[in-house]
């Protein structure tokens, strides 16, 4: 098959980008021809593009036109869409639907019903928007702490809910928990076809090569991921502060909004290695005692 993959990268690399890359590789390994349409929110970080972003996040005509042209010229058999926020907009979903081929959308979060996507606010579970409406996010500035930016996200998802953008397509989500929550929210605010929502776990790349025995590994732990509250980095740093000189070496791989705070703690047993390529990260994990997962 010839498959079109569509994805908008965030300004900071994250898990969605990794899944997108892994699925692309998996499809190609199994003999499919993969055509990629990808953009990055970094493109709209400055100048006129930044000024136009609030409008394009709701409906990006150019992106929709690009998708239609690719599908017509490349004779695409199926479309798999990942993230559309902010630069692509859900308009690319509508464009793909109009071309008459199967369309699959992977939901990596709960953004159809929750503007910040994670059902958390101030460190606690929050389901105000799924139960009472997207407008609740405006009161709490749920997207990046900005009422203006939250308004853009609310407008985009409200409009495309009304237009039925997510109906008539297959939707995948990585876990059964996600599926159950999405079905619960969809009964309150009908947004997609419930019978077309399925669980598709994220692919896992299994490292190959020699295995280092545990007793031969270095006395170090690895924290890998976006450096933000959601991933539990603050908790990990505080734990290493308490352990003090008795702590093993902690290698922090990644970048994000908490990077400056974490580095400012100046803990002797914590080192920051930045954003690593997947192979380098796997090698680092292979020679370490354990991986810290705190989210």
Model-derived features: positions:
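N-terminal subdomain of nucleotide-sugar transferases
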Residues: 1-40, 72-74, 92-102, 241
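Active-site proximal beta-strand in glycosyltransferases
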Residues: 78, 96-143, 172, 198
């Amino acid at each position: 098959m010839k498959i079109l993959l569509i994805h908008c990268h965030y300004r900071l690399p994250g898990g969605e980008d990794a899944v997108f890359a892994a699925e692309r590789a998996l499809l190609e390994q199994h003999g499919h021809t993969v055509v990629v349409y990808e953009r990055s929110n970094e493109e709209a970080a400055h100048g006129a593009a930044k000024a136009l972003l609030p409008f394009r996040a709701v409906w990006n005509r150019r992106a929709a036109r690009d998708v239609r042209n690719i599908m017509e010229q490349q004779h695409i058999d199926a479309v798999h869409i990942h993230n559309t926020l902010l630069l692509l907009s859900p308009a690319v979903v509508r464009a793909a639907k109009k071309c008459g081929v199967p369309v699959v959308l992977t939901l990596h979060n709960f953004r159809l019903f929750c503007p910040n996507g994670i059902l958390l606010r101030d460190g606690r579970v929050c389901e105000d928007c799924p139960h009472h409406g997207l407008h609740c996010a405006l009161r709490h500035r749920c997207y990046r702490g900005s009422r203006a930016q939250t308004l853009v996200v609310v407008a985009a998802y409200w409009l495309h809910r009304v237009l039925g953008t997510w109906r008539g397509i297959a939707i995948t989500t990585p876990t059964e928990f996600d599926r159950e929550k999405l079905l619960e929210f969809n009964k309150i605010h009908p947004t997609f076809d419930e019978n077309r929502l399925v669980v598709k776990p994220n692919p896992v790349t299994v490292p190959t090569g020699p295995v280092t025995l545990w007793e031969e590994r270095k006395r170090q732990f690895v924290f890998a991921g976006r450096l933000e509250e959601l991933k539990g980095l603050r908790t990990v740093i505080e734990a290493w502060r308490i352990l003090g000189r008795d702590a093993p070496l902690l290698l922090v791989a990644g970048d994000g909004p908490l990077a400056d705070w974490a580095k400012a703690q100046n803990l002797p047993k914590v080192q920051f290695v930045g954003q690593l390529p997947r192979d380098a990260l796997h090698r680092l994990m292979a020679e370490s005692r354990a991986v810290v997962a705190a989210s």
